[in-house]
Design a protein with these regions (language model features):
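Low-complexity, intrinsically disordered short peptide segments enriched in small/polar/basic residues
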Residues: 10-11, 184
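C-terminal motif of bacterial Sec signal peptides marking the signal peptidase cleavage site
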Residues: 18-21
């Protein structure tokens, strides 16, 4: 009996060691699974963009004190969101649109652009006492949004000197994840640029045929589209040219690509996120 006791304890110790050894892989598996879950959660959290929670509001700017009988009229309506980068991007594009009304192209803030616009109006009024101050009304909206892609539309109504501007629209596309503006060349597959050019030029030639003899003399033979305003909706992408943009007297031109054409032209990962 005394001989059996040491043997019993010997086998008991071996059994406990075996159980402990069996436990280690399970513990490692659990730790590995937890690490994977934490990594996945971290990646998902990093890719989740702030909810926009869009609110219409008056833009943040100030006009100088006016002692004249006829004072400048500036009204900038904007969109405010939970995404601070997007808010700054919207203000930057509004500043660019305002500058385009007075044929300027500088790196200005919204307030600086308004100051430049006011200065131009003052110069006009100083030329002749009966000259009226400028009027500028900007309406801003998010026209389309798909995942990280946002389409901004800025509409302009203005009265400058003897020129009245009504419903002039500008389009801008942003990638919120990369925090950058996107041109049409940024999203098109490089090997599809020639194919897209053929589509655009074909639409352009059809448009030219419908224009007056005067406009036909003014417009270029080919349309340059690399830096054109572009947009996306529920069906596809397109490019936009404002009235008087192609030539002095040319009307507006919008070229729409079909869903199939858009799928063919766009980079696959962008198409998947945009449509």
């Amino acid at each position: 009996m005394n001989t059996l006791k040491p043997l019993f304890f010997f086998f008991l110790m071996i059994g406990m060691m075996a159980l402990t050894a069996c436990d280690h892989p399970k513990k490692n598996e659990t730790d590995s699974a937890q690490a994977t879950e934490q990594h996945t959660a971290a990646v998902e959290k990093a890719e989740v963009l702030p909810y926009l929670n869009m609110q219409e509001a008056k833009a943040d700017y100030a006009l100088p004190f006016c002692e004249k009988k006829n004072c400048i009229d500036v009204d900038i309506q904007t969109i405010k969101t939970q995404d601070e980068w997007l808010n700054a991007w919207i203000a930057k594009n509004q500043a660019n649109v305002i500058q385009q009304q007075i044929e300027q192209n500088k790196n200005l803030t919204l307030q600086q652009a308004i100051n430049a616009y006011v200065k131009k109006s003052d110069e006009w009024q100083d030329k002749y006492s009966k000259n009226k101050a400028y009027e500028l009304h900007l309406n801003t909206r998010i026209a389309s949004q798909r995942n990280q892609y946002v389409l901004l539309q800025v509409g302009v109504n203005a009265q400058q000197e003897d020129i009245a501007v009504k419903d002039r629209f500008y389009f801008f596309v942003a990638d919120r994840k990369l925090q950058k503006s996107l041109s049409v060349l940024d999203v098109i597959q490089k090997n599809q640029q020639n194919a897209l050019n053929d589509i655009i030029q074909a639409h352009y030639q059809q448009w030219i045929e419908k224009q007056s003899p005067e406009v036909k003399k003014q417009v270029p033979k080919k349309l340059y589209w690399g830096q054109a305003d572009w947009f996306f909706d529920g069906e596809g992408i397109g490019v936009h040219y404002r009235a008087n943009e192609i030539s002095k007297d040319a009307p507006q031109l919008d070229i729409y690509l079909s869903t199939e054409q858009s799928k063919q032209m766009l980079q696959p990962d962008i198409y998947q996120q945009m449509f």
